[in-house]
Each structure stands twice: as structure tokens, then as C-alpha cells.
Curated annotation (Swiss-Prot):
Domain of life of the organism encoding this protein: Bacteria
Keyword annotations from UniProtKB, A to Z: Cell outer membrane, Cell wall biogenesis/degradation, Lyase, Membrane, Signal
Bilayer topology term: Peripheral membrane protein
Protein name per UniProt: Membrane-bound lytic murein transglycosylase F
MF terms (GO), sorted A to Z: peptidoglycan lytic transglycosylase activity
Signal peptide: 1-29
Originating organism: Pseudomonas putida (strain GB-1)
A GO biological-process term: cell wall macromolecule catabolic process
Length: 485
């Protein structure tokens, strides 16, 4: 009997302990999304592969969205892990899956059809949806002009939502949604006449138009809209709150503005004829000198594509050019600079590239240590054009105006003042054509962007072999070579 009683007591204690353990376990709170990210030490992000969002070049990962989300990961003190989606449905569906991405950073616009799936962040970039057509074809000016046209947009996109709304007032409007294309593909299809029209956001057109010289804006559709990040609707708000705090801070401290300037502050400088001409020269002239750019870039430890962009801005890759001021050769060196860099024949493209590379890096190394990348590169380019003395004058003016003398975004505002008497009389080195280095830097940045995009690893070697298809450059000339209005 005593044995049975003892057994019952032990069982009761065991059941009590087990129940207490389960009860306590149930009371332990599940870690929040933000806590899980910090515990894992990794921020898993899904995005799209395009010039306006994210792509990989020979130096690694880059893109507006990539850099912005990298700043966020650094704020959290975690590593960034990127994956790309083939289409928007795949991107949205990936959020919330176990061990999947917790954040979508892909230039998304809030969509009613997605609100059951995701929660959107505060805005960080304002864009305008635009109807795109091919130059030389009839230009639609309103929604009625879309009827009877072959239109394609990204499947599940906010542009598809816009067309659905327009169709209510224009029943004859038909369009195709595709999950097999990206924005670059849609613009190429318009450029080559495969489709009549597409819809894209203004920032993506700005980044891509230079590759497709025939595309034009027909008209803007509706009001401007905001791009946002997204998290899964089923997640708690801890990560979303942190994202919103970060984006608000980035807006106030200038991080967003610097990124906008870096990626969008120079995209409209080429114009139609310039874009078409550059694309032709990319195929016809660059292959002759590419090995020299690569060789001396390696010696000087600089990106060869940046050197090539400087060379194109200076001479359009023509080795025998001479200006009215006496600068000569592919890199347009002065006699004094050529002598200092050990160049005996400025018209020899190999020597010119060697001298230009050496001179550019000399300028860059002599800049004030307080100037950090990427601004350091833009400053060096400006000094390559106008001289370090005038650049320092512009930095001094920036200080007087309570601007940041170490940021290109601020200093480029001061450079044009060097041609105005009321300003240059206050400087050490006096008058300069200060607007020139601003355009010089903007052009080189744009050429560099294009070279970076077309020399991605999967396209390696095709430029040199003459096999690279540069969008907008076919055997036939474009329909109209007049600049866009």
C-alpha cells in the first residue's frame, strides 16, 4: 500500500513538474522579427536584378537599393545577404517563408493587390509612372491613345494595376502581363519595335534610357508615387518600425540624397545623339584600346572602366585629337603633364593611357585625407579637368556657405561660381570655367555606368570580340536621330 502511495505521489510530482515546464514554456515570448535578425547576425533581403536596383559587376555588388539596404544592415550591426527574384510574384511570395528573406528592397510601389501579403515602409524615393513608346512611331498623348496598341508590363506590377484602372474607362484597352521579363527587357522590346508601348517608373527609365536611344516618354500616368520597402504581413512590426526609423534618419542626415545624386544625379547628361554615338564607339573603338586601359589600370590600381570613361570624355577614344589649347592625344594631356608623367609621344595611345592613369591617381592621392569615397573619385575627376587649385577654391566657398567641402553634392554647386567675378575675386586661384568640371564629372559617371553594366561577368569578353549587343545599336540607323524633346 505504501508502495502504491509513493508511486502515486511520484507520478503526481512528475505530472506537476511537466505541466509547470509546459506552462513556463508557453509563457516564454517568441523572439520578434528584429530580434531574430540580430541573433542570426544576417539581414536576408530579396530584390530585383536591374541597373536601378541591384546587380553585380567585376568589383562586386552595387545598385541604389543595394547600397541603401547595406546602410540599414550596418545600422543593425549584421551582415547583408541578398537574393534576387525572377519576377514580382516570386519576390512577394518569398517574404515570410521559413529561413527566407525578411525584407523586399526592390523599388516597390504600394499596391492594393499586395496589401494582404505585405506591409510597406515609409517612402524613400518619389517616381512617376510613364508610358513609353518608340521614336518615329505615333505618340499617344492620353489613355485613349493606348487602345489598339501592343502593350506589355511586368506581371503583378503597380503598372498592371494602373492599366486595369484605365481599362475601366477604355474597354478596348488590352495589355499583356509577363513574368518572363524585367524592365530592361521591356525597354529593349519597345526600342526594337517588338511591342508598341510599356509602362515604367521615371527612375528606371532614367537609368536605362541611354542603352535604348529610340525610346521616348509618351506621357505621365497619374500622380507621382512613392517607392517603399516591404515586409511580410504576418510578421510583427519590430523590423518594420526599425526600417521606418532608419529611412527617416537617412532622409534627414543626407544619406538618401547622396545616394540619389550618385545614381540619378548624372543620368540625363548624354541626350539621344550622345547615347547612340557612345554605343557605336563602344563596339567600334573601345576594343582597340581596351587592353591598354586594363593593363595600366592594374598598374595604378584603378578601375579600367573609369579610365576608359575618362578617355572617352576627353577624345571619344581618338588617339590623334588636338585641341585649340594644345592638349593632345587619347587622354588629352598637356605638354607639361605629359613630361611630368614620362610621356614622350602624346599621340601614342598606349603612352597617353599610361600617362593619364598615372596623372589621375596622382591627383587622387594628393587630395585631402578627409575626402572619402565615392566623393574622392568625383573630386579627382574634377581636378583632372580644372586643376586642384580651383577645386580647393570651390571647397573653400563651400565652407563659407556652410556646406560640406568633402561632399561632391555640395562642392559641385560652388564650382560654377568660379566664373563669376563676385565669387572668384574672393578665391586664391581666381577665374575658372567652373561649370566645365561639373559636366565633365557627370559625363564620365554616365559613361562609367554604361561600361559597368555592359561588362558584367556574364558579358565578359564580348566587347573586345565585337559580339556584344549594345541596345539601340543595330545595323540600321534609328528612326530619328534628333535629340529628345
Amino acid at each position: 500500500m505504501f508502495a502504491h502511495t509513493a508511486l502515486r505521489q511520484r507520478c503526481a510530482k512528475w505530472l506537476f513538474a511537466t505541466g509547470l515546464f509546459l506552462l513556463l514554456g508557453a509563457c516564454v515570448e517568441k523572439p520578434s522579427t528584429l530580434e531574430r535578425v540580430k541573433e542570426d547576425g544576417v539581414l536576408r533581403v530579396i530584390t530585383r536584378n536591374s541597373p536601378a536596383t541591384y546587380f553585380q559587376d567585376r568589383n562586386g555588388e552595387t545598385g541604389f537599393e543595394y547600397e541603401l539596404v547595406q546602410h540599414f544592415a550596418e545600422d543593425l550591426g549584421v551582415k547583408l545577404q541578398i537574393e534576387t527574384a525572377d519576377n514580382l510574384d516570386e519576390l512577394y511570395d518569398a517574404l515570410g517563408k521559413p529561413s527566407g528573406p525578411v525584407l523586399a528592397a526592390a523599388g516597390l510601389v504600394s499596391s492594393e493587390r499586395r496589401k494582404a501579403q505585405v506591409k510597406y515602409s515609409h517612402p524613400y524615393l518619389e517616381v512617376t509612372p510613364q508610358v513609353i513608346y518608340r521614336n518615329g512611331r505615333p505618340r499617344p498623348t492620353n489613355a485613349k491613345g493606348l487602345v489598339g496598341k501592343k502593350i506589355m508590363v511586368l506581371k503583378g506590377s503597380s503598372h498592371a494595376d494602373l492599366l486595369a484602372e484605365l481599362k475601366k474607362q477604355n474597354p478596348g484597352l488590352e495589355y499583356e502581363e509577363s513574368d518572363a521579363v524585367e524592365v530592361v527587357d521591356l525597354l529593349r522590346m519597345v526600342d526594337e519595335g517588338q511591342i508598341d508601348l510599356t509602362l515604367v517608373d521615371s527612375n528606371e527609365l532614367a537609368m536605362n534610357q541611354v542603352y535604348f536611344p529610340n525610346v521616348r516618354v509618351a506621357f505621365d500616368v497619374g500622380d507621382t508615387r512613392d517607392q517603399r520597402w516591404a515586409v511580410a504581413a504576418g510578421e510583427d512590426n519590430s523590423l518594420l518600425n526599425e526600417i521606418n526609423e532608419f529611412l527617416d534618419k537617412a532622409q534627414k542626415n543626407g544619406t538618401l540624397q547622396r545616394l540619389k545624386d550618385r545614381y540619378y544625379g548624372h543620368v540625363d547628361v548624354l541626350g539621344y545623339v550622345g547615347a547612340y554615338t557612345f554605343a557605336q564607339h563602344l563596339q567600334q573603338r573601345l576594343p582597340k584600346y581596351e587592353k591598354h586601359f586594363k593593363s595600366y589600370a592594374k598598374v595604378e590600381q584603378v578601375d579600367w572602366r573609369l579610365l576608359a570613361a575618362i578617355g572617352y570624355q576627353e577624345s571619344m577614344w581618338q588617339p590623334e585629337v588636338t585641341s585649340k589649347t594644345g592638349v593632345r592625344g587619347l587622354m588629352m594631356l598637356t605638354q607639361r603633364t605629359a613630361q611630368a608623367m614620362g610621356v614622350s609621344n602624346r599621340l601614342d595611345p598606349k603612352q597617353s593611357i599610361q600617362g593619364g592613369a598615372k596623372y589621375f591617381m596622382k591627383i587622387k592621392e594628393e587630395l585631402d585625407d578627409s575626402i572619402q569615397e565615392p566623393d574622392r573619385t568625383w573630386f579627382a575627376l574634377a581636378a583632372y579637368n580644372v586643376g586642384t587649385g580651383h577645386l580647393e577654391d570651390a571647397r573653400t566657398l563651400a565652407k563659407r556657405e556652410k556646406l560640406n567641402p568633402n561632399k561632391w553634392l555640395d562642392v559641385k554647386k560652388m564650382l560654377p561660381r568660379l566664373s563669376q567675378k563676385q565669387w572668384y575675386r574672393q578665391t586664391k586661384y581666381g577665374y575658372a570655367r567652373g561649370g566645365e568640371p561639373v559636366h565633365f564629372v557627370a559625363n564620365i559617371r554616365r559613361y562609367y555606368d554604361i561600361l559597368t553594366w555592359v561588362t558584367q561577368p556574364q558579358l565578359e569578353g564580348q566587347v573586345a570580340e565585337g559580339n556584344l549587343h549594345v541596345p539601340g545599336v543595330n545595323k540600321d540607323k534609328p528612326a530619328d536621330q534628333s535629340p529628345p524633346m
